[in-house]
């Protein structure tokens, strides 16, 4: 076995230390360290199991409600950590009938649960939520929930990551049966993790309540909000042209001018773009929250700026 050069090993160690120092701040035994809490939020169907990442420091903090998809195998905790590092509280939760939360699962229950969690944030006096700086971030079916939740006036901006516009399943079937079949397969597979529902029942609900569930139904209030939509050219689950573009067009038709869209050569879970997507999301929300000044005109160029359309 070839021995590694000790000088090279030391150099690699120093490089690692430098990267850690750039990315991570160590707080030691300060009075208000970053922390993590498991929270049970009372919902209309019982307990909503939630996790809260709190940022360092006294006082209130800008807050992100992070919404996972269906069934939620990808919960984007790395994104939660990235947002906390720059000063956000991040609250994520499991929908009714999902991953231990009480009740039965349904698409309309997802929307109601998100409203319940937002109301919890607005009424809480314990954890230091800044009630004037609340944002929503959602991935996949969580992007659908995020879009609907961001219509609430208390939400100041939103981020949709590979969103699933579940209310458009019928229209998508007319445009691409292959894409629609993929959504049906996801619903069927996801039902194994969900209480009180089948894939067929979810599909029926999506079609029966399509007008209420489609993201375009929220276009008018969303036209007044800063919104970032990130899609992937290799995403075969929720291709942006079927799931994101119709919402963007509807918002623009309502006069919306606060949209940003990004597209990367990656899959539905942005598996090889995790750090890039996290950087783009944090940069977008930092600017909205006033944590950092706008990048425009600074003389430096964001890694996220190249793909903005």
Regions inferred by a protein language model and the residue ranges of each:
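The alpha/beta-hydrolase serine catalytic core
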Residues: 155-157, 161-258, 262-271, 277-278, ...
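Catalytic nucleophile-loop/oxyanion-hole region of alpha/beta-hydrolase
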Residues: 71, 98-131
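Short beta-strand element of the alpha/beta-hydrolase
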Residues: 60-69
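Primarily recognizes the serine-hydrolase "nucleophile elbow" in alpha/beta-hydrolase
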Residues: 123-127, 131-180
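Conserved alpha/beta-hydrolase
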Residues: 84-100
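Catalytic active-site module of serine/aspartate enzymes centered on a nucleophile-bearing elbow/loop
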Residues: 264, 270-309
């Amino acid at each position: 076995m070839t021995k590694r050069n000790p000088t090279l090993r030391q150099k690699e160690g120093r490089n690692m230390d430098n990267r850690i120092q750039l990315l991570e701040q160590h707080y030691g035994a300060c009075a208000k360290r970053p922390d993590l809490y498991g929270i049970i939020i009372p919902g209309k169907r019982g307990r909503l199991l939630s996790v809260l990442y709190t940022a360092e420091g006294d006082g209130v903090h800008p807050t992100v409600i992070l919404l996972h998809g269906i069934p939620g195998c990808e919960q984007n905790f790395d994104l939660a950590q990235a947002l906390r590092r720059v000063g956000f509280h991040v609250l994520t939760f499991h929908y009714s009938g999902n991953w231990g939360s009480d009740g039965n699962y349904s698409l309309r229950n997802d929307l109601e649960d998100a409203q319940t969690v937002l109301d919890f944030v607005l009424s809480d006096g314990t954890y230091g939520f800044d009630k004037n700086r609340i944002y929503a971030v959602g991935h996949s079916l969580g992007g659908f929930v995020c879009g609907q939740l961001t219509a609430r006036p208390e939400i100041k901006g939103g981020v949709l990551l590979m969103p699933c516009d579940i209310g458009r399943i019928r229209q998508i079937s007319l445009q691409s049966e292959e894409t629609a079949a993929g959504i049906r397969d996801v619903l069927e597979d996801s039902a194994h993790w969900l209480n009180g529902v089948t894939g067929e029942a979810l599909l029926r609900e999506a079609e029966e309540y399509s007008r209420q569930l489609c993201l375009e139904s929220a276009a008018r209030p969303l036209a007044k909000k800063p919104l970032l939509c990130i899609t992937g050219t290799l995403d075969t689950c929720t291709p942006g042209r079927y799931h994101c573009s119709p919402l963007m067009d509807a918002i623009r038709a309502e006069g919306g001018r606060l949209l940003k869209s990004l597209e990367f050569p990656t899959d539905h879970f942005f598996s090889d773009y995790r750090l890039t997507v996290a950087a783009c999301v944090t940069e977008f929300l930092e600017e909205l929250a006033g944590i950092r000044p706008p990048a425009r005109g600074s003389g430096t160029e964001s890694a996220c700026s190249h793909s903005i359309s």
